[in-house]
Amino acid sequence: DSGRAEDLQREVHWMTEASLATGRPVTFGLAQSRRHPTAYVSMLDQISESAKRGARIFAQSTTRGIGVLFGFANRTPFDRASSWRALRNLSLKEKVAKLRDSEYCARMVREAKDNPPPIDFSQIFVLPKGDVRYDLGIEDSLQTHADRLGVSPGEAFIHLALENEGETLFNYPFLNPQFDAVQHMLDHPQVVIGLGDSGAHCGQIMDSSLPTYFLKYWVKERQHFALEQAIYMLTSEPAQLFDMHDRGVLREGAYADLNVIDYDNLRLPPPTFVHDFPAGSGRYIQRSSGYDYTLVNGQVFMQGLDHTGAIAGRVLRSA
């Protein structure tokens, strides 16, 4: 709408003026939204015009959708219902036992129908086992599974969870939901890979796999980017944006962190939920395979999935 367009123009205007006045880069997060699915295109057009004026404005975006994870390992879309909420503090094994209790399960199904969440079930996707896929379509949605089974979305959620002993995960990509939009942004010269969330919402979002997914999907599977270009986009390009000239390059005297990758065997399974925070609190993790070694300042920091004990990192300070 016109009000939205004016808001975007106002934002780009002040960023442009700030960059022109200071000579410094300005960066911001950019993603496609469901409510305004083409607004990102307007932003790209505007920052392109700003770049022609000499402004250094760069958007940061992701290599796939930004999604909330649902599952009985932690939170579900139906937790406003008391019977669902009552499971929150149980172990996964105890939750599965409750789900297999026909009387309790019937109560859960009934309450999920009576108190449905304000969410579109056709936009919640079942993550497959094995190598994870995020490029899912309507046929993979919770609503489609419910229609196929002839049950409500809440009952389908339970059914799909029990197929995997409660470990089934569901992804709700609320930003960057369309891969064509992601590709459009990744191809744009004023867009840098960034914007991942794996800390602030560690029980809801798992974005630490974004670099691996970029290599696995956009490079290896889609062959949309050459491997050399992809490595540059993950390393040198973001380092240059923040004027870290001694990072992101293989050069004598630079503080390079090196990953030795078995590219043919690069794998990315679905996230898992672990309880390794203080007081037994939980978080999502996502372990990839195919990284043989990670070297930090010349020392082997990780060998496979195992930390070697080396602590060779140094605090980064702006020059």
Give the role of each language-model region.
Residues 184-191, 196, 208-210, 260-306, ...:
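C-terminal cap of metal-dependent C-N hydrolases
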Residues 135-136, 239, 283-286:
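Short loop/turn motifs at secondary-structure junctions and domain boundaries
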Residues 1-3, 29-31, 59-64, 194-196, ...:
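Generic beta-strand/beta-sheet core signal
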Residues 132, 140-148, 153-183, 214-265:
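C-terminal helical cap
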Residues 23-25, 54-58, 121, 188-191, ...:
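Active-site lining segments that contact anionic ligands and/or coordinate catalytic metals
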Residues 29-35, 200, 220, 273-283:
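Short beta-alpha connecting loops at secondary-structure transitions
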Residues 6, 11-198, 207:
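Polyanionic/metal-chelating signatures
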Residues 199, 203-219:
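Long, structured ligand/cofactor-binding scaffold of large enzymes
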